[in-house]
Design a protein with these regions (language model features):
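Short, charged/polar "capping" segments at the starts of alpha-helices
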Residues: 5, 56-58, 100-104, 124-125, ...
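Donor nucleotide-activated moiety binding/catalytic core segment of transferases
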Residues: 37, 184-242
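Catalytic binding pocket for nucleotide-activated donors in carbohydrate/polymer assembly enzymes
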Residues: 90, 111, 116, 234-309
Length: 338
């Protein structure tokens, strides 16, 4: 229910000094209209969202310049950015790193300021679990299963994931390697994820770790694995930037599932519908045998472009600094933390 204060503010927005185009935009989007009225009625100094690709939040940041609006990136962004460029124009974006900034700029996104601070989730994980995990598993499959995602919206992801899961399961069975699965679904869809897995593998032969965001269960099982394998999951890119051995796989010609902007012959990429099980196995043999120090030497220049993890401050500390500065009225300008 709308408070009287918000209703009065909505009337003021329509009858006040805003231009005709702005008033038309508000009438056309009632939710935007209500949110702007709510913000206007409480006059905040800072407005933050963890939904970085929200068109409404971008619009609000332009319609209400008196506050510091900050969108915090919550997932990896690929070539789909070009399709959203028309509305990705938030005034301040806290992003994973250089790849995100370059992708947004090259796609024509009118973002006011980029703060390349890394991944907030990854930072919270590293703060809670600062010690390097002891390796318990040879391989980890990073699940990206979500019921609607696989059945309706991303059939290519479903195809890639099934192919990858079957290849990896067979490889581990043949080579005597241990396999863990980092679950994707939260408790409300856990049963469906388990049913999906049982269609393609024998779950009694693997260690399945359900996704528990509060305990960072997926992050932990990835760090406890010698090699993690995924299609293009955000948590995979985070682990890759922490120095983990991660292999990204796309068994189609669809660039949506590629690691963007990177030559496909890299040791951490498997790509193409022509990839055979034999080729897949040879790649995994090579990655598994590499020492971590050698792996990091081969990958970290690229990895840090995706998710910055090398700065002295954790992402949450950088975020606190930005918000504290905005609360004190000291607005920063330009791109930070390059």
């Amino acid at each position: 229910n709308l408070s009287l204060r918000v209703v009065l503010q909505m009337c003021y927005l329509l009858l006040g000094r805003r231009g005709l185009n702005e008033r038309r935009a508000l009438i056309a989007d009632p939710k935007l209209f209500m949110e702007l009225a709510e913000i206007d009625s409480i006059s905040p100094k800072v407005v933050v969202t963890f939904v970085d690709n929200s068109s409404r939040f971008s619009s609000l940041s332009r319609l209400y310049p008196r506050a510091f609006f900050l969108a915090v990136q919550n997932g990896f962004r690929g070539i789909e950015v070009a399709d959203m460029a028309g509305y990705l124009n938030v005034t301040n974006l806290f992003c994973f790193g250089e790849d995100t900034r370059n992708r947004y700029q090259n796609s024509g996104c009118d973002v006011g300021r980029y703060i390349m601070g890394g991944s907030l989730k990854d930072g919270l994980y590293r703060e809670r679990f600062p010690q390097e995990e002891k390796v318990e598993f040879d391989f980890c499959w990073i699940s990206q299963f979500r019921p609607k995602r696989f059945s309706e919206t991303l059939p290519g992801l479903a195809h890639n994931s099934i192919t990858l899961l079957q290849f990896l399961y067979e490889y581990c069975k043949e080579s005597g390697k241990s396999l863990a699965i980092a679950g994707s679904c939260k408790s409300n869809a856990l049963t469906e994820e388990i049913e999906f897995l049982r269609k393609y593998i024998d779950l009694t032969r693997v260690t399945f770790v359900p996704n528990d965001p509060l305990e960072f269960s997926s992050y932990q099982v990835i760090d406890k694995s010698e090699v993690s394998v995924t299609v293009n999951s955000t948590i995979g890119f985070e682990a890759f930037s922490r120095g983990n051995k991660v292999v990204f796989c796309n068994f189609t010609n669809d660039p949506y599932y590629d690691v963007p902007g990177i030559a496909q012959q890299k040791p951490w990429i498997i790509r193409g519908p022509e990839i055979t099980y034999s080729q897949f196995s040879m790649k995994l043999d090579d990655v598994h045998q590499k020492k971590r120090e050698i792996w990091r030497g081969l990958t970290q220049i690229d990895a840090q472009k995706f998710v910055k993890t090398t700065q002295s401050l954790l992402p949450q500390e950088i975020l606190r600094r930005e918000i504290t500065r905005a609360m004190s009225g000291k607005m920063a300008v330009g791109t930070e933390l390059e």
